[in-house]
């Protein structure tokens, strides 16, 4: 699968989700995750859903214990940040080898999730919630 691996030490990728932006670096290592200088478990409050989301692109390619993930992330909440990190890691893996693109794309790790908070409209209480209607 990895026939054209480049001899580079660091692979970069940027991911976005909602208002979160993650700059992800992949370094050959043993599967360590560091987010904003803290361990991945600590930063994500030991939430297995978020941790599995981050590891998903590496697991798709069978490389979960081959690379360390170093991340700078800002904006949004934990779910948005975890998905931004996932997309950034997938993009970094594409930089590692062009052969990685197809399996990552079929799993949906490279596509940006367009869902975001809908804006509030005037005359309404929230984005779609209208004030109580009174017939008389």
Swiss-Prot record:
Gene3D superfamilies in the cross-refs: 3.30.230.10
SUPFAM superfamilies assigned to the protein according to its UniProt record, in alphabetical order: Ribosomal protein S5 domain 2-like
Compositional bias segments (type: Basic residues): 117-136
GO molecular function: RNA binding; structural constituent of ribosome
Pfam family name, one: Ribosomal_S9
Gene Ontology BP annotations: translation
Stretches with biased composition (Basic and acidic residues): 98-116
Any one cellular-component term (Gene Ontology): cytosolic small ribosomal subunit
Keywords: Ribonucleoprotein, Ribosomal protein
Annotated region described as Disordered, given as residue ranges: 97-136
Family to which the UniProt record says this protein belongs: Belongs to the universal ribosomal protein uS9 family.
Protein name as it appears in the record: Small ribosomal subunit protein uS9
Gene name tied to this protein: rpsI
């Amino acid at each position: 699968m990895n026939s054209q691996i480049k001899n580079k030490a660091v692979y970069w990728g940027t991911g976005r989700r909602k208002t979160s932006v993650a700059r992800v670096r992949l370094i050959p290592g043993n599967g360590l995750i560091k987010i904003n200088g803290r361990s991945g478990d600590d930063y994500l409050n030991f939430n297995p859903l978020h941790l599995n989301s981050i590891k998903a692109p590496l697991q798709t390619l069978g490389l979960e214990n081959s690379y360390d993930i170093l991340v700078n992330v800002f904006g949004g909440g934990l779910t948005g940040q975890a998905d931004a990190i996932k997309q950034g890691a997938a993009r970094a893996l594409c930089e590692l080898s062009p052969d990685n693109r197809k399996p990552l794309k079929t799993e949906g790790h490279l596509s940006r999730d367009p869902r975001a908070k809908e804006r509030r409209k005037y005359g309404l209480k929230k984005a779609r919630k209208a004030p109580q209607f009174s017939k008389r």
